[in-house]
Structure formats: structure tokens, C-alpha cells
């Protein structure tokens, strides 16, 4: 191959999918005699890494590149008259989790094709507490949610999703007691919130009807 798998993740996934049987018979892949088509995704563009405040060295890939990789594999399998099992060892914590993203819609469509089976990895986040599910009772005005951020963290992107037709607003209370009142829904565009003592800046954006799901998105 003209390139190498520097991370080793793709090689590991290929072994799980199609690895040959070991000498002692303790391991072999799901389909050890299959033919393998490999797509190596290029890293996400710098401006996207900056926008999402990704840590240096963190692996990140663009959804459109993944979709183009799937298209290539579909054409490759069709040109050889072979069925396709498309294994994606990639994941994200973003999105509505309802299959309404462009990639989600593509995978749902492919799942209905004869001779095409999308296989996705899941569960790697385990108990890392990167998701929170809550609700506000009728007799309550708000619910407190605590975010624990490491000292070395330069920043992160957080998404809050409401279940249609619910709408929410957010406010903030810093560890030193600085309080930001709830930001009204009437505000359009980005809202910049600054905590002077923590030297922290928060950007809030309301999307009251996200294009794919129709639900409210706050990020």
C-alpha cells in the first residue's frame, strides 16, 4: 500500500473483520477468507479542528469524506459483482442520535440495499459520562447540570438537544460564583459569555428547529 496506518486502529479493525486464524486457534476474524477494500480517511481540515476546539493529536475526520469513502467501496464492490460489508470503526458524540445526519441517512439507505451491510462500532465511550439525559418537571423552572472540565483542557463543544416540540434556554454559574442569566430564545446568532475570574469564554447558539431532526439544538 502507498500509505501506512500510523494509528493502528484500521489494522486492528481489519484483523477483527478478516484476520486469519492464529497458530493456536485462539483467534480468527469474522470472515477470514474475504477480500478487503480499504479507504484511509484524510484528517479533518485545520479550520474545522479549530472550530471544534480539538486537542492536538486527536484523530478527527469529516463526515463528507467518510461518505465519499463509502461511495468508493460501493462502486468497487459493484465493479466486481461482489456483496459488500462496510465496516466503520468511527464514532462521534455529536448529533441528534436519531439517524438524521447526512451520514446516518446514507447508512440507513444502504441497509436496505441487497448485498450491502453497514457494520458500525459502538460502546467505546463506556462509562466516560460524555452524555447526560435530563428533564424538567412541570412544577420546576430549571435543572442544574454540572460540567467537569480538566485544567489542561483548552476548550470543547457541547450540544444540548431537546425533544420536539420542547424548547429550552441556558444560563451559567461558574465555580467562583459568577452567574450568567438565562439567554433568551429571541437572540439570533452567537452569544458570547465571558467569565473574568476563570478567564473563560462561552459561545451559545440556539437553533430552534435543526434541519435534520426538527428538534431544538443548543451549542
Predicted segments with their positions:
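Hydrophobic side chains in beta-strands
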Residues: 18, 38-41, 88, 160, ...
Amino acid at each position: 500500500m502507498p500509505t501506512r496506518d500510523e494509528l493502528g486502529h484500521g489494522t486492528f479493525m481489519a484483523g477483527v473483520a478478516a484476520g486469519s486464524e492464529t497458530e493456536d486457534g485462539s483467534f480468527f476474524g469474522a470472515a477470514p477468507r474475504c477480500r478487503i477494500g480499504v479507504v484511509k480517511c484524510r484528517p479533518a481540515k485545520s479550520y474545522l479542528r479549530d472550530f471544534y476546539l480539538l486537542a492536538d493529536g486527536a484523530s478527527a475526520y469529516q463526515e463528507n469524506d467518510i461518505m465519499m469513502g463509502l461511495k468508493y467501496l460501493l462502486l468497487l464492490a459493484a465493479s466486481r459483482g461482489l456483496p459488500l460489508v462496510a465496516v466503520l470503526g468511527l464514532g462521534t458524540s455529536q448529533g441528534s442520535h436519531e439517524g438524521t445526519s447526512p451520514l446516518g441517512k446514507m447508512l440507513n439507505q444502504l441497509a436496505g440495499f441487497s448485498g450491502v451491510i453497514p457494520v458500525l462500532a459502538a460502546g467505546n465511550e463506556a462509562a466516560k459520562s460524555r452524555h447526560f439525559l435530563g428533564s424538567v418537571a412541570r412544577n420546576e423552572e430549571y435543572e442544574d447540570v454540572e460540567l467537569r472540565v480538566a485544567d489542561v483542557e483548552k476548550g470543547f463543544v457541547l450540544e444540548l438537544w431537546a425533544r420536539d416540540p420542547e424548547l429550552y434556554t441556558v444560563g451559567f454559574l461558574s465555580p467562583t460564583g459568577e452567574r450568567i442569566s438565562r439567554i433568551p430564545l429571541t437572540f439570533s446568532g452567537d452569544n458570547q459569555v465571558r467569565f473574568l475570574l476563570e478567564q473563560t469564554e462561552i459561545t451559545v447558539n440556539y437553533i430552534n428547529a435543526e434541519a435534520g431532526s426538527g428538534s431544538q439544538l443548543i451549542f
